[in-house]
Amino acid sequence: MITGQTLRDAILSGANNIANQRVRVDELNVFPVPDGDTGTNMSMTIGAARGELEALPDTCTVAEASKTAASAMLRGARGNSGVITSLLFRGFSKALKGKDEASAEDLANALKMGVEAAYKAVMKPTEGTILTVSRLAAEKAAECTEMEIPAMWDATLAAGQAALEDTPNLLPVLKKAGVVDAGGQGIMII
């Protein structure tokens, strides 16, 4: 089971990871607009939750940690990638509502609901982006709910990484530029 403290700390770790690698992600940014700000926007979005998450007690529930993060990210979302990131967390949070701890099945369902929220909110979902990476990772998580959570998470991350590496085959602008999707890379870093 994952506790609220573990989830809180994992989200904070993700915020640190993207903050430290935002320039690298910015450099990948060629879709939908090559404005070089995907890493910055994702970092600012998840970073908007930092203070509120740090204020949560170690006894917080997964429901409290996820709702706190999702609410702050929604308020602080920047750019397309930031909005999609906040929606992934919003759906994730809704799936954990009322839960003290999360099982592997709970986490897989939360990832699925996050992906559904993001796809529903995007007018024209494009494959080969953060959406694809998130969806394929969530699908793998759903296949692995009988595993211990660390093993499930490793399999989920491996599926997300494989999906990320395939993004140039799905989106010609990425292949032409010789890069993977910036938003997909950002979500894998988080």
Task: Show the residue positions of the predicted features.
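N-terminal loops that bind phosphate or other acidic moieties
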Residues: M1-I190
